[in-house]
Amino acid sequence: QVLTARTLHGVMQNIRDIVNLKKSEFWNKGGPAWQKIVVCLVFDGIDPCDQNTLDLLATVGIYQDGVMKKDVDARTRLVHIFEYTTQLSVTPNQQLIDPNDNVTTSLPPVQMIFCLKQKNSKKINSHRWLFDGFGRILNPEVCILLDAGTKPGPKSLMSLWEAFYNDKDLGGACGEIHAMLGRGGVFGRKLLNPLVAA
């Protein structure tokens, strides 16, 4: 729950930074910037999924408990797909962030697709759902993959997108990862072994 909140809230803050751009040839052309971004969550199996995480997604409106059916007409469902546009977010500290009048701190609408796979079919299958399933329909210019728990830094998604936008021959890119050491690096001072710290 905390890991999902950390990632999802960081993504929503990054989308806010993109929407707040004043001078952009791409993002401000042909409609609001938020309409050009889709956040797709792919969860690998109902059984291993944490109920608290589903409650978090229900809080922001992406998930609805009780509407899924394991089979329809005696055919087992492969996935359950929910879509929603939300301005709500939950911080890693479990605080609900809702829209407000402050334009710079308020979160913009974010289009979300939540794909909850019936069975745990591993990560490669999840990637296939993203690229083969949703990618063929949405036809995105750029896909950025994040694991739950990864907190994107300020403007980090924008930096990755700019790399692709400015170089049409670019086939892949990766961001830089830093360990979260806690407030004031409390954990960092206790990690004396550099291999453990890495």
UniProtKB/Swiss-Prot annotation:
Keywords from UniProt, A to Z, are:
Cell membrane, Cell wall biogenesis/degradation, Glycosyltransferase, Membrane, Transferase, Transmembrane
Annotated coiled-coil segments of the chain: none
Q: Which reaction does it catalyse?
A: [(1->4)-N-acetyl-beta-D-glucosaminyl](n) + UDP-N-acetyl-alpha-D-glucosamine = [(1->4)-N-acetyl-beta-D-glucosaminyl](n+1) + UDP + H(+)
Which Gene Ontology BP annotations are present? cell wall organization; chitin biosynthetic process
The entry's cellular-component GO terms read:
cell septum; plasma membrane
Top class in the EC scheme: transferase
The EC number(s) this enzyme carries:
2.4.1.16
Recorded family membership: Belongs to the chitin synthase family. Class III subfamily.
Function statement: Polymerizes chitin, a structural polymer of the cell wall and septum, by transferring the sugar moiety of UDP-GlcNAc to the non-reducing end of the growing chitin polymer.
PANTHER family assigned to the protein according to its UniProt record, in alphabetical order = CHITIN SYNTHASE (PTHR22914), CHITIN SYNTHASE B (PTHR22914:SF11)
Identify this protein by name. Chitin synthase 2
